[in-house]
């Protein structure tokens, strides 16, 4: 994502809008390309993009669209959108969206499911919903993340889920070792 530099922040924070851009990457040489392609132009279209996430098959790009900035969970108008990278068609994931904020999202490994954060239940707390996405990029009715006793669990929960990620297995990497690798800035195989 890219936005025009603004020296008048934070006063004009509502004017900051992020465009969605694409640039080639050479994996072998670890270099970015030189041509930047703007997929969503915030200045022309009027809203801001955050959390672009590519489907595992590379066909679809899901993202959050909201009025300004990049912290979409605080924007009631924030909705999930999809971009078909074969046709360049951009469209809202209407069945995933509500009157409240939908924000961070994550694809399943097979690209047929998404988990996303939503405030649809009460407008205050972020809960996780899971929805099916078919091969044409159409979302189907999502459901609240199941719990053993959902009424007790969700009524008593005083925390929000903000950054859901679907995992294939349990995380087995030692947290201290991971932090050390991140701080070093060096490539490492943590298996």
Predicted feature residues:
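Sequence signature of WD/YWTD-type beta-propeller architectures
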Residues: 1-191
């Amino acid at each position: 994502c890219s936005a025009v530099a603004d020296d008048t922040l934070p006063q004009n924070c509502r004017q900051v809008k992020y465009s969605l851009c694409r640039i080639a990457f050479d994996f072998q040489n670890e270099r970015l390309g030189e041509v930047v392609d703007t997929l969503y132009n915030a200045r022309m279209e009027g809203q801001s993009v955050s959390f672009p996430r590519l489907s595992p098959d590379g066909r679809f790009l899901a993202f959050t669209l909201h009025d300004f900035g990049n912290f979409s969970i605080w924007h009631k108008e924030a909705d999930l959108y999809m971009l078909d990278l074969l046709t360049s068609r951009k469209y809202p994931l209407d069945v995933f969206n509500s009157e409240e904020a939908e924000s961070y999202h994550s694809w399943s490994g097979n690209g047929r499911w998404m988990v996303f954060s939503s405030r649809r239940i009460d407008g205050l707390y972020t809960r996780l919903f899971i929805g099916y996405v078919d091969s044409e990029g159409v979302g189907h009715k999502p459901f609240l993340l199941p719990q053993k006793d959902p009424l007790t669990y969700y009524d008593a929960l005083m925390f929000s889920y903000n950054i859901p990620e679907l995992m294939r297995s349990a995380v087995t990497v030692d947290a201290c070792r991971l932090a050390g690798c991140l701080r070093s800035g060096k490539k490492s195989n943590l298996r």
